[in-house]
Swiss-Prot record:
Multifunctional protein that functions as a downstream effector of RALA and RALB. As a GTPase-activating protein/GAP can inactivate CDC42 and RAC1 by stimulating their GTPase activity. As part of the Ral signaling pathway, may also regulate ligand-dependent EGF and insulin receptors-mediated endocytosis. During mitosis, may act as a scaffold protein in the phosphorylation of EPSIN/EPN1 by the mitotic kinase cyclin B-CDK1, preventing endocytosis during that phase of the cell cycle. During mitosis, also controls mitochondrial fission as an effector of RALA. This is RalA-binding protein 1. The lineage of its organism: Eukaryota, Metazoa, Chordata, Craniata, Vertebrata. The gene is Ralbp1. Interacts with the GTP-bound form of RALA (via effector domain); during mitosis, recruits RALBP1 to the mitochondrion where it promotes DNM1L phosphorylation and mitochondrial fission. Interacts with DNM1L; mediates its mitotic kinase cyclin B-CDK1-mediated phosphorylation during mitosis to promote mitochondrial fission. Interacts with the mitotic kinase cyclin B-CDK1 during mitosis. Interacts with the GTP-bound form of RALB (via effector domain). Interacts with REPS1; the interaction is direct and does not affect RALA-binding nor GTPase activator activity of RALBP1. It is an enzyme of class 7 (translocase). Residues 154-219 are annotated as: Mediates association with membranes and could form transmembrane domains. It comes from Mus musculus. It is found in: Cell membrane; Cytoplasm, Cytosol; Cytoplasm, Cytoskeleton, Spindle pole; Nucleus. It catalyses: an S-substituted glutathione(in) + ATP + H2O = an S-substituted glutathione(out) + ADP + phosphate + H(+); ATP + H2O + xenobioticSide 1 = ADP + phosphate + xenobioticSide 2; leukotriene C4(in) + ATP + H2O = leukotriene C4(out) + ADP + phosphate + H(+).
């Protein structure tokens, strides 16, 4: 039995019946107006209308009637939930409205009629749901009513808020479109030809290998020789992908934070992603042919000749890889990896057959005996501005670190000039420049200390009795060094005094500006207090004013936060400017020293010509004595000597 929930008034079926011909209207049957169907239409004492002929007498109650009674109770409960609806068996079609005979025969509401076995079966299989279109219409109607209620409840302030929120949502969509057009794409390192990766990520020491390969091999040489099943056990994929993404961005992650299996998987991934075979397509068949030679000597000679024909980068990477894996095989007791295991792992990775790999591993000394795995030293970092980094102590260490930093500086300049806008690279550029300034200053101090120790040792070893002309010549060199140091110190002091005067003038102007700003702040505060006292009498507790105050408070907090960020940037810029000034002072000192040396070299030939013109009267003064006199005269004439005692 299907149930269609039909509204009591203006249903579509009634309209169709009314529109058809003969103007006949359907009279409700006795079942449709039964008191059990519509309780409340009849009084309780009145007898109910006669039932249909198909119903059985009430005294015989069968099992079917009991089941039917249960269904009737359920139907009554459902009626209470849906008031104003009637349950019909079928909607009357237009054909029924046309013929009156059909109207009389039409069975109305068969709720209490005992169905036959076939009808009961049909009723159980019919669907008791509304059509989908009617449900969709009802949902739309409910949504429209909900929107109408909301629009009625909204106030003017809510409408303004909604308009502002829509405006804010629209604005940021248009802004980020412009920088996305200019941002160049960063090329990856994995999957590119070996020569390109070498040109982009080669280390400072000039070894033509990619940085990812060098760093992975160094790490595995340190930490992977005691790991069981190395290069056979795979690392964690998420960590391998993380390292791969970092190297693709041309960063240098700290591999010490990862496990050996993860780094080994990263190295295998790089070798697997190489677009070309290490032995090249042209030479690969010839390597296979060389494996078929009869004697081992012929195999080695043919392999040596073929390896010389390989490109430089391919030959170098292959030699480093074979030597490194030979170290792994040498630690077989700890790594559990022999030649067979390494060949099984490496063959699908580098696309080289097991026969060729076996020859390479069994003749490492003959083929790659001169290869030495050079350890990479990372450049010095100065991440924390509050502390000074630990600089090398010896001159050789300082010069080596300067070479590393200058190589890194050139790479950063090349990337930034290529159009790649990266804030992290710009910050690293400033960091490298600061480190270079500190290293050069430390190198000068080390040279000065070395000269002083040399002079002290020479003075201590000298004795007054054993003074000769050869020793005097050696002392002249010491005197010249001392004079050069004195000149350098004097010129540097002059530049520092000039910088001091400039900074004092700047400080005075800044103090005046601070006083002016304080006066303005005091004046504004007094005006605000005066304005508050006037407005307190006429102030009203309106919602709009409180909202404006909240917005102003938010704007004020935002401005304060921006001001703090600008102050931090200003401090960084001031530090950088100060370092650049120090570098300029050093360059000026060097220029002045070069000018003084050039002037001395021009004066020396003139002094040598004068005694020749005089006829050789009197012996020429010693060069060392002349230099001492010239230095003393310059020291007297220089104004920096009078300023030595002035505090800086």
């Amino acid at each position: 039995m299907t149930e269609c929930f039909l509204p009591p008034s203006s249903s579509p079926s009634e309209h169709r019946r009314a529109e058809h011909g003969s103007g006949l209207t359907r009279t409700p049957s006795s079942e449709e107006i039964s008191p059990t169907k519509f309780p409340g239409l009849y009084r309780t004492g009145e007898p109910s209308p006669p039932h249909d002929v198909l119903h059985e007498p009430p005294d015989t109650v069968s099992d079917d009637d009991k089941d039917h009674g249960k269904k009737k109770g359920k139907f009554k409960k459902k009626e209470k939930r849906t008031e104003g609806y009637a349950a019909f068996q079928e909607d009357s079609s237009g054909d029924e409205a046309e013929s009156p005979s059909k109207v009389k025969r039409s069975k109305g509401i068969h709720v209490f009629k005992k169905p036959s076995f076939s009808k009961k079966k049909e009723k159980d299989f019919k669907i008791k749901e509304k059509p989908k279109e009617e449900k969709h219409k009802e949902e739309k109607h409910k949504e429209e009513k909900h929107k109408e209620k909301k629009s009625k409840d909204l106030t003017a302030a809510d409408v303004v808020k909604q308009w502002k929120e829509k405006k804010k949502k629209k604005k940021p969509i248009q802004e980020p479109e412009v920088p996305q057009m200019d941002a160049p794409s960063v090329k990856p390192i994995f999957g590119v030809p070996l020569v390109d990766a070498v040109e982009r990520t080669m280390m400072y020491d000039g070894v033509r290998l990619p940085a990812v390969f060098r760093e992975c091999v160094d790490y595995m040489e340190k930490h992977g020789m005691k790991c069981e099943g190395v290069y056979r056990v795979s690392g964690i994929k998420s960590k391998v992908d993380e390292l791969k993404a970092a190297y693709d961005r041309e960063e240098s992650p700290n591999l010490e934070e990862y496990e050996p299996n993860t780094v080994a998987s990263l190295l295998k991934q790089y070798l697997r992603d190489l677009p070309e075979n290490l032995l090249t397509k042209e030479l690969m068949p010839r390597f296979e042919e060389a494996c078929g030679k009869t004697t081992e000597m012929e195999k080695v000679q043919e392999f040596q000749r073929l390896l010389r024909e390989l490109p430089e980068c391919n030959h170098l990477l292959l030699s480093w890889l074979i030597v490194h894996l030979d170290h792994v095989i040498a630690k077989e007791l700890e790594t559990k990896m022999n030649i067979q295991n390494i060949s099984i792992v490496l063959s699908p990775t580098v696309q080289i057959s097991n026969r060729v790999l076996y020859v390479l591993f069994t003749h490492v000394q003959e083929l790659f005996g001169t290869v030495v795995l050079k350890q990479v030293t990372r450049p010095l970092r100065w991440s924390n501005m509050a502390t000074m980094p630990t600089l090398p102590e010896t001159q050789a260490g300082i010069k080596e670190e300067i070479r590393r930093q200058e190589f890194l500086l050139n790479c950063l300049h090349r990337d930034l000039q290529g159009g790649i806008k990266d804030l992290s690279k710009e910050e690293r550029l400033w960091e490298v420049q600061r480190i270079l300034t500190a290293l050069k200053r430390k190198l000068r101090e080390a040279k000065r200390q070395e000269c002083e120790t040399k002079i002290a040792q020479e003075i201590a070893s000298l004795s007054k009795e054993d003074v000769s002309k050869e020793e005097m010549n050696e002392n002249e060199e010491v005197i010249n060094i001392l004079l050069a140091q004195e000149n350098e110190i004097l010129t540097e002091q002059e530049e520092l005094l000039a910088m001091e005067q400039f900074l004092r003038r700047q400080i005075a102007s800044e103090k005046e500006e601070i006083d002016r700003l304080r006066a303005e702040i005091a004046e504004i505060q007094s005006r605000q207090q005066h304005g508050r006292s006037e407005t307190e009498e006429y102030s009203s507790d309106s919602e709009s004013e409180s909202e404006d105050e909240e917005e102003l408070q938010l704007i004020l907090e935002d401005l304060q936060r921006q001001n703090e960020e600008l102050e931090i940037k200003n401090n960084h810029l001031n530090q950088a400017v100060h370092e650049e000034r120090e570098a300029i002072i050093e360059l000026r000192v060097q220029l002045r020293l070069l000018q003084m040396q050039r002037a001395k070299s021009e004066q020396q030939p003139q002094e040598e010509e004068e005694p020749e013109r005089r006829g050789g009267i009197g012996p020429p003064p010693c060069d060392g004595v002349l230099e001492v006199r010239v230095a003393k005269e310059q020291a007297k004439a220089s104004p920096s000597k009078d300023r030595k005692e002035t505090p800086i």
